[in-house]
Amino acid sequence: MEASDQSQAKLTLSFGGIQHAFSVPIEDLSALQDQKDAFLRSRSQASLSETREPCSPAELMLDYLEFLSCRNLPPPLTKPVLLAFSRNFLHNTEIHSLLAKPEYTPQTRRRLVRTYYMAALSAAESHVKESALLDAARQGNFQLAAVFGGQSTANPACVRELAELFAAYTPFLGDLISTAAPTLSALCRLPETKEHFCGRHIDIETWLHDPASIPDGDFIATAPVSCPVVGLLNLAHYAVTCHVLGKTPGELRSHLQGVTGHSQGIVAAVAISLSDSWESFYEAARMTVETLFWIGFECHQRSPRTSVSLDQVQDSLQNGHGRPSCMLSIVGLSRAHIQDILLKLNRSLPEDEQVYLALDNARDSFVVAGPSCSLVHLHTYLRSLKADASIDQTRIPHSLRKPTVQHQFLPISVPFHTPYLQEAARAIKERLFPWRVVSGKLTIPVYDNRTGNDLRKSDNVNLIHTMVDSICWEPCSWPAALGIENISHIVAFGSGGVGELAMRLKDGQGVRVIIGSEFQSRDEEIGTKADLFSPTLLASSTIVGSWGERFRPRLSKSPTGEVKIETKLSRLLDTPPLMVAGMTPTTAAWDFVSAITNAGYHVELAGGGYYDMDAMAVAVKKLVASIPPGRGITCNVIYASPQTLSGQVTLLRRLSSQGLPIDGLTIGAGIPSLEVVSEYIQALGLRHISLKPGSITAIREVIEIAKAHPDFPIILQWTGGRGGGHHSFEDFHAPILRTYGALRRCSNIILVAGSGFGGSEDTYPYLSGTWSAQYGLPAMPFDGILLGSRIMVAKEAHTSPAAKRLITEASGVSDSDWEKTYQEATGGVITVVSEMGQPIHKIATRGVLFWAEMDKTIFSLPRTKRVPELLKRRDYIIKRLNADFAKPWFGQNSKGEPVDLSEMTYIEVLRRLVALMYVSHQSRWIDPSYMTLLMDVSVRILERFSIVDELDDALVLREPHRFVENIVRLCPPAAHDILSPEDVAWFLLRCKARGQKPVNFIPALDDDFETFFKKDSLWQSEDVDALIDQDAGRCCILHGPVAAQYSQDRDEPAKEILDGITQSWIDMIRHDFYPGGVTPSSDSGSLSSESWSVLTPDLTSRDESALLDIIPEMQAYCPSISSLGRSGSPWIHALLSDEFILQGRDRRPNPCRRVFHFGPGGSLQFDRAKSEITVSMENHAGNRSVMRIVCENGADISVDLQQPSAYTDEMVSLPLKFQYDPGMVPVGISEVMEGRNERIKSFYSKVWFGEDICRGMNARSVFHGSEMALTEAMHRDLLSTVSLAYPHSETALSGVDVFPISVGMFPVWDAMARPLVVNDIDGDLLRLVHESNTFEYCEASTPLRVGDVVSSTAAVRAVYIEDAGKHVVVEASIERSGKPVMKVVSTFLFKGVFNDWNSTFKTNKEPELVLDVQSDLDELVLRDREWLLLHDPSQSLVGCSLLFRLETQVTWKNRNTYRSLDVSGLVFLQQASDDLKEIGAVAFHAGECVGNPVLSFLQRKGSPATSPTPLTSPGWPGVSSLEVQLPTSNEMYTRTSRDYNPIHVSPLFSQWADLPGTITQGMYTSAISAAVLEHLALNGDRRRFRRFSARFTDMVLPGDRLLVNVKHVGSIQGRMLFNVSAFKQATNNMVLEAEAELEQPPTAFFFTGQGSQKPNMGMDLYNSSPVAKAIWDEADKYIFETYGWSILDIVKNNPKTLTIHFRGKHGRKIRANYLSMENKTVTPDGQIVKKPILPGLTDQTQSYTFTEPSGLLFFSTFAQPSIVVMEKATFEDMRSKGLIPQSAVFAGHSLGEYGALLAFSGFMSVRNLVDLVFYRGLSMQFAMERDERGETNFGMVAASPQRVGKSDAVFTESHLRSLVQMISIASHELLEMVNLNIENEQYVCAGTDTETQLLLEEMSTTEDRTTTKLYKLILKSIPATKKLPMPIRLQRGRCTIPIPGIDVPFHSSYLRSTVSSYRKILQQYISEEDVHLERLVGRWIPNVTAKPFMADEGYVREVFNITQSPILKEMLEL
């Protein structure tokens, strides 16, 4: 019933996260609802130990059903729930299949099965479903046999197993138990038996109903108990099967072709054959248990009784071998081996203690029986015989290994199947006299477990006797019992692993084993209860073909009539199943690999022959270019060489990404981890991977890898130990015999045999599988054969003729003798140990025999003992090296005598290098790196002897002997001076340099001797000319000892060798498998990595329905696909199913195939008449893209992709052309490349710009964008589009009219994208990637705002080629009002492989570089550069800092070489004022060259002019990350940005471009990320955003969630430097990384004046900052040289006195400097008087002393320069760290104004400013009249009006001004307010000491603010103040603070007379050209005006009004 039925209602169960609703009748709903509530309450209240959480809705419902059943409710209430359960969960299955899932525990399964069947029987509902397995048997499709188990390791648990079975199937077993239990109970209570049982009776019913009462396992395991119980258990399983299937025992039996049993299982087998009804079954059951009872009892009583010591028992138990018993299982030895052991053992035993081979279970599995004491002896012997599990035997030759044996005592109390029980058998027969079974009563065959004969044909009148004998004393042969012919399935009943025993025997014979007593199986090919009961045929129930049938080779005929061999390997590779292995050096030669490939065979390029990745890349590319288009290549790499492997895998990944067909990777010398293999599979785009295991353990590792990648082909190449080259110690056959079944269970493993092969006769048995017959096993075919050594003598092989002769002279050996090579040369081959420490087979040449000798005598020693032994045998070893080995001893003097390296002269070294590395008679170097070695040694020699000369590279290449003689001429001492120890060490180190070919000599007998001896030892076999005397007997030649017997012909082409073998195979296959001579036709084609696993070996033609399997999900919404699949057109088949197409020689994924995988929203139409396919797809916005495919002639395919235009109502078409060629394999479709990229560019031009390509434009053109108004709508659209990604849209919105910096792309897009479609930049726009984007505001420009009208231009700055493809860099400029406002730079990448170097160029404005010329040598080196053109060559540059502003223009010839190089630019002198003075130019031009010598020099000698300063602790104090989510469509950004690239909006185009979806524009991701930075770091103030440079690192799709992180990482040029990164949250992959520059918040810099000084100021920075230290040191040096004192001493120590001495030349110069400093004063009569600035100083003064009680740092003369220098040092340190914003405003307080101007405007040098302020300090200090104490009676005090009087009264600036004026007027002395610092808070007053003291007193005491009273108080106080003793020491008051160290009334009218003279001093120091108005205007805030400085008349007038300056008056013409 359906839930919609009005008579039904929903009932919902919900518990523990599981919920299920089902329908019940309405009338039962209320009652069931109540029961449900009670059920859920009971579950909630139950403890965890009482109940289990349901794991599925089915379990929850069965739990509910169990609850209902336990409450004894009437069946009508339970039945609706049962029916609902069956309806919902058992519609197409049954209960066992449902519960077979691994989430159910065995206990849960039993409980749920019991619940189900109890409920079904209670409700009288049928539970029976027709078994699909039995139905197939009934129809004759399957042939079933049943087997029953016997005694086993499960004996102790047999009763418990029976109890568990009874608990699950109680309703089905009641009758059987009630039949058997009383029988057994009575038998064990008989007088003759009760003494044995002694009250422990066999009480089955008690045990079943109360499992806790079951006795211990030892008792149960005894034969009297276990024998009948095991028999009962067998019958119980059979009975359950009958009941579940609803059949009688006879009906089930009728489906069986026969039965048998293992040991005592034969009794159950006979019982089944006798049973045709339930009555006869129960009668047979009674007979079975009684027979087995007496067998167990009598055998137990009559077994030999022996004792085993307690120690022996404990030893056996502790080692996991079980308790010693009468039967011992042995696995791992052959029958003959065991019989031999038993024969020897029994000779030492008395007759009554001998042991016998009791059971033969399998080829290497047996059971020996006898007295336990004797079996303990056997057990002990086996332990000594077998291999220790902890010892690795993989490096021991197979024949010398100890066998791997498993032996276990069985819990069986009697020695069944031995003569010891013959008497027992007679007694048993007497006991069973009433029972009689004659053969005629057997209704189906019962197969004797001794002979395999059908017992129906037995001559024995009573089969009871036959069974007794077969169990008691006759040996059991399980192989004979299972030798049942013509069966497809074996159903096993019972425990003890009888099913696994059957599987072990029948594996590979085409027999499926089903264990009818288990829910689960450890082997996926073994069926279970589910297979037995399922109403549908399960995969594990089907017929499984024999290995011989499934994997044998087949023949097929191609459409051309060619007969081909088909195996799994041939289908995968589309080649014959004969391949050539990767061999170094043989298949390292690309041309040889090409020859084999072009012959039609698979071969591996040997990566082991390449140490240089560039050379390997060249080889791969040449190989690809030389083989048929589309044919893939496979590279062989060596896992044991990790560094080389890493480089080669990286290279192959790069080449694969470029489209080169890297189909396969073969990994030798080790099995990588699963993770590594997975990475290779994913990263390299492989179609298959080959692994070469060397042991059983390694084979199992490969199996695990294959299981982890079940859909990916894994080729397992097995070579064993007999292979040529590196090999294992394994026997060839044994490991495969043990693992073949496991290998074939992995359908994706392709098994290839290699080693020892050379012809068709020796290889065919392995291809057909008959090789295994000699081991008594079923056929075990390999999928392919691997040839290696045999191919080394092929005509095309590079093996030298002399080496080929040595190969053919080697006789080789048979498979049985190859292990002798470990000890000696055998068949001309010997094993040595390679550099990797692995055994390796080589032809036994003199050199290799010496190698073997060294392995035994030297390399076998511990490493610490090797060198002493080498030195001990030095002369012998050197002699052998020089006489016999490929690598001679290097040391040799000019007389030809062997010497050590340290005894050679430098020239002898050079001559020896040339002699060994240069093949003189062929005028060639062995390797280019050897030439480099000679050059390096030569340079070292010249350096050693200080010779400066250029070496002639060309001469080294052409005539190295002349080159060496030139060295002798240049450096005569080198001919007789021996090498210094340093040069000896250097030479040895240089010989080991990475990246060069290993040296071909032995330079020393040291720790590296083995490396020098063994490394790179194989190449000479292909270059005998490079050997001394061209002696091939010196070299190493890889070859296999077995294969050597086939290597005879030295002139046979590889194709003939391979074709000969293949053709012979075809003849043999036809003879063996096609007796009729008919060969089926085939067009099955090649096997792809996706579809190969569904193809069976029987496939001989392409199944059209397989096409639909490729895209099954489409049929639901696209019925047209069915008609397309049935079209029968080969070209359509290819479009749908071919994995790749060809583009030229590059293989690309088939785009049509991808497009056909469209989802909902797509449609397909097929017009058969027109041969036209139309696919249409709609995107989120409802826009539809179309693909139209037409092929009228079956060969020429036209594909038209159509996209809606943004400019018109018409579609824009992209026409693409393809050709189909069925004869081109494995890739049948190729794209027509002529004009392709031009057609794509035309399409994009129309999509992007609404017009076709402008033919007049090229890559060097300037592209103009249209003028654009930045409107409010544009502003709103951009912000709205970006805000879509934010969790709260207001995050990205802002009320200001400033555009985000990302708007820069909008005005320039038109101009920037147009270069991408010009014809001279070749590339596929469908593969275009936007790599990076940079937006940068121009200096001093303001951000773009609403209302701006802008224009743009763009130009291509670079077109260059890298591994990833062709990069195009476009730079655009945005102008506003004719001025540049922003620069936008984008880098685009055309993915692919390009060689059009003529189109490449790059124009680059280099970062500015600064070069400090610090010495004469620096200047000399610089002037020597020809490219430097100085305007004034006579000008000295020492001490100068030069700034280089350069532009580089290059074109390329190839990846590493420029075709042309031009460097031009200007050179500037950096002046102290930060001004730049042009002093020269750079002009450099070169043709073909490598590198940029100009930049190389400047980068090496100089440094960047600006560089970022990193933060020590990067981060951000606030929120530093934000999660965003991309909109589900890119439509809105596409419209806003006008980037109409269809890959962003069209599913059809994105699929065609092989993208995972409509990828989001990088510009959009960039805009979002920039907005996040605005939000988090700028609080939305985007005016401070100056630069954003983003690189796009991964694709982003609509809907992706990104986490955007921001980090403050440093500063640059006053801006904050941020890193921004965005990560996909789902994968944690970075999708964007960016760098941003933000202006700091508006900042003002304030410089303090005098009074701020303190000791040690700036010294911390002096000690930590090189920049600050340099300024202090410069000032200190200058002051000391000029004025005789140290500013550092003043600051650090603050001395109270300082004496400057004027003695000596330097002293006199200092005195003259002081004398030149004068003060000019005006006398009362108007005369100008000049006085020395230091009072009393004359030209005779010998010294002068300065004194200050507070310390000279508080003396104006020293304080002022100290403060200014400190400020300058601090500022420059900040500037060097990029902390000074370029727009910052600045001001200085009093003296600080000098520091501010010096820092920001650079209006004079530090030296000049020191002069100026020192003069200022002196002039002010000594302009005052002083008394005899040096006092001036003047001071300055800071006053705070706010602190005056009571808090409720107000004392303001005006009050203070009035007070100061009143004091001055009243006293007639100076007191003025001179500094207005903080309004109403701080002012500074200057005046006489008495006036300032009076001010202090009045401000501290006054309460009355009235002028009259205040004036009176002042008048009253003056007399007392004037009477104070002098000098007056001002004290700090409540409102005033005296300024210490200042006794000059600065800024007061008292000093007005000094202004004129000081103005003149300033005019001397400040030159007009040093004043930069742009640094001052708007930024400098002068003291005088307290307003930003402006250079206009109004500002000048304002200053004049304040200062009355005559200069300004003149300027204003007043």
Curated annotation (Swiss-Prot):
Enzyme Commission identifier(s): 2.3.1.86, 3.1.2.14, 2.3.1.39, 4.2.1.59
Family, similarity comment: Belongs to the fungal fatty acid synthetase subunit beta family.
GO terms, molecular function: (3R)-hydroxyacyl-[acyl-carrier-protein] dehydratase activity; [acyl-carrier-protein] S-acetyltransferase activity; [acyl-carrier-protein] S-malonyltransferase activity; enoyl-[acyl-carrier-protein] reductase (NADH) activity; fatty acid synthase activity; fatty acyl-[ACP] hydrolase activity; pigment binding
Applied use: As colorants, MonAzPs are widely used in various food products for centuries. Moreover, MonAzPs also possess wide-ranging biological activities such as antibacterial activity, preventing hypertension, lowering cholesterol levels, causing hypolipidemic effects, and displaying antiobesity and antitumor activities.
Keywords: Hydrolase, Lyase, Multifunctional enzyme, NAD, NADP, Oxidoreductase, Pigment, Transferase
Reactions catalysed: acetyl-CoA + n malonyl-CoA + 2n NADPH + 4n H(+) = a long-chain-acyl-CoA + n CoA + n CO2 + 2n NADP(+); holo-[ACP] + acetyl-CoA = acetyl-[ACP] + CoA; holo-[ACP] + malonyl-CoA = malonyl-[ACP] + CoA; a (3R)-hydroxyacyl-[ACP] = a (2E)-enoyl-[ACP] + H2O
Ranges for region Malonyl/palmitoyl transferase (MT/PT) domain: 1645-2005
Pathway, per record: Secondary metabolite biosynthesis
A Pfam entry, by short name: FAS1_DH_region
Induction remarks: Expression does not seem to be regulated by the azaphilone pigments (MonAzPs) gene cluster-specific transcription regulator pigB.
UniProt entry tagged with the keyword Nuclease: no
Domain MaoC-like: 1514-1627
Name of the protein in its database record: Fatty acid synthase beta subunit pigK
Quaternary structure, from the entry: [Alpha(6)beta(6)] hexamers of two multifunctional subunits (alpha and beta).
Gene Ontology BP, a term: fatty acid biosynthetic process
InterPro entries in UniProt: Ac_transferase_dom_sf, Acyl_transferase_dom, Acyl_Trfase/lysoPLipase, Aldolase_TIM, FAS1-like_DH_region, Fas1/AflB-like, Fas1/AflB-like_central, FAS1_N
Gene Ontology cellular-component annotations: fatty acid synthase complex
Region span, Enoyl reductase (ER) domain: 570-815
Keyword Cell membrane attached: no
SUPFAM superfamilies found in the cross-reference section: FabD/lysophospholipase-like, Inosine monophosphate dehydrogenase (IMPDH), Thioesterase/thiol ester dehydrase-isomerase
Phenotype of the disrupted gene, per the record: Leads to the accumulation of pyran intermediates devoid of the medium-chain fatty acyl moiety such as monascusone A.
Highest taxon in the source lineage: Eukaryota
Annotated segments matching region Dehydratase (DH) domain: 1126-1606
Function: Fatty acid synthase subunit beta; part of the gene cluster that mediates the biosynthesis of azaphilone pigments (MonAzPs), a complex mixture of compounds with a common azaphilone skeleton very widely used as food colorants. PigJ and pigK form the two subunits of a dedicated fungal fatty acid synthase (FAS) that produces the side chain fatty acyl moiety of MonAzPs, a beta-keto fatty acid. The chain length control of the pigJ-pigK FAS is somewhat flexible as MonAzPs features either a beta-ketooctanoic or a beta-ketodecanoic acid moiety.
Residue numbers annotated as active site: S263, S1790
Region (Acetyltransferase (AT) domain): 144-515
